[in-house]
Amino acid sequence: MLNAGNPIGVMDSGIGGLTVVRELQRILPGEDIIYFGDSANCPYGNKTSDQIFDLSCNMLRFLGDNGVKCTAIACNTISTLSDRLRPCFDYQIISIVEEAAKYVVREHLTSVGLIATEFTVASGKYA
């Protein structure tokens, strides 16, 4: 277990991140999880970088205020801003983009399919 007293945060722009929650519950059954899916403002893919940043900061503040030890960003679009978000918070923020890229390299994959918003594709983070 990571840190028994504090929950893990998972955030997404909608409900897709519930698949991440389900997998975390499977591999870390003793961990508490707080999920924040911002379905009120989705989709994020047609928003500006600053709009996505502000909405993401609101979610991360909420999760931090609720004592998470780390947060997994379960949204490709938000993950493209993880380098900009991390300095604003004093707990670990894990990007699905970075973790997916590590997996592709580790497994020596040469072809990968991706469902992404225009914002995510334009960011070049998966290039």
Regions found by a protein language model. Give the residues of each.
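Non-catalytic structural scaffold of enzyme domains
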Residues: 1-127
